[in-house]
């Protein structure tokens, strides 16, 4: 019997942005390509999301409410996320 779709999901250890903030990534691989999704958490509460779609080669980051993160946390988030996505795509 032929499978309709093949899907594999992998969860990663949190990426530390600051003492109170991290990103929890999950990678999903399907026949149509790879999707990477991350929840941005501060003090255990979701304050944003990151998603990357290999099919369209785009990344979307949303932080809401923006005022929940410090300028340093936002800078660190944008400094680390592209490297994390690249590593996940090439493993």
Residue ranges of each PLM-predicted region?
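Viral virion structural and adsorption modules
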Residues: 1-91
């Amino acid at each position: 019997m032929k499978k309709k779709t093949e899907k594999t999901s992998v969860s990663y250890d949190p990426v530390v942005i600051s003492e109170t903030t991290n990103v929890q990534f999950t990678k999903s691989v399907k026949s149509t390509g790879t999707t990477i999704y991350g929840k941005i958490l501060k003090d255990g509460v979701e304050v944003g999301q990151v998603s990357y779609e290999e099919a369209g080669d785009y990344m979307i980051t949303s932080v809401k409410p923006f005022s929940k993160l410090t300028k340093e946390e936002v800078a660190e988030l944008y400094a680390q996320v592209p490297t994390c996505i690249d590593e996940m795509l090439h493993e």
